[in-house]
């Protein structure tokens, strides 16, 4: 293993799995309202992670549902150990268009799709599995 931080580098596959579970968890919350799977992937330090979960929760309030709006992990661009206990993963993601629908089936709001964009996840490898502690939208 060619890394200045071999213990963190050894956790790269598990960190990538956590990022995949984050995307799956957001989509699960969007479909069901159950936020537990996505919350299990990040620490309380990840403000952008928490705001994403809260945004979905807010859209589902009042018995609303969401149609579409899934986020997609298009590619993993890089995954490197950046400190003794940190892995940085750069990905490309996109999001489908969505509709917020009320309990009668009426569309309340529509949201356009988002084109592919780069996102950087920083994960702490002290825990097993690793957890996301920071999320940065690299294109903004």
Which sequence ranges carry the predicted segments?
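Short, well-ordered helical secondary-structure segments
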Residues: 43, 58, 76-78, 108-110
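A short, amphipathic edge element
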Residues: 61-79
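Exposed beta-sheet edge and beta->alpha loop/turn motif
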Residues: 80-140
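Generic secondary-structure boundary signal with a strong preference for alpha-helix termini
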Residues: 37, 45, 74-75, 117
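Core segments of small alpha/beta cavity-forming domains
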Residues: 1-67
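Generic alpha-helical hydrophobic packing signal
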Residues: 15, 19, 76-78, 121-124
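Detector for Asparagine
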Residues: 2, 27, 47, 77, ...
């Amino acid at each position: 293993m060619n890394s200045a931080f071999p213990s963190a580098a050894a956790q790269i596959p598990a960190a990538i799995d956590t990022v995949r579970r984050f995307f799956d968890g957001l989509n699960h919350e969007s479909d069901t309202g159950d936020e537990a799977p996505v919350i299990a992937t990040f620490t309380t330090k990840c403000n952008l992670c928490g705001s994403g979960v809260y945004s979905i929760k807010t859209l589902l309030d009042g018995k609303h549902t969401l149609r579409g709006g899934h986020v997609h992990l298009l590619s993993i661009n890089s995954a490197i150990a950046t400190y003794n206990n940190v892995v940085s993963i750069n990905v490309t993601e996109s999001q489908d268009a969505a509709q917020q629908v009320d309990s009668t089936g009426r569309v309340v709001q529509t949201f356009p799709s988002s084109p592919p964009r780069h996102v950087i996840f920083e994960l702490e490898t002290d825990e097993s599995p690793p957890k996301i502690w920071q999320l940065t939208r690299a294109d903004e």
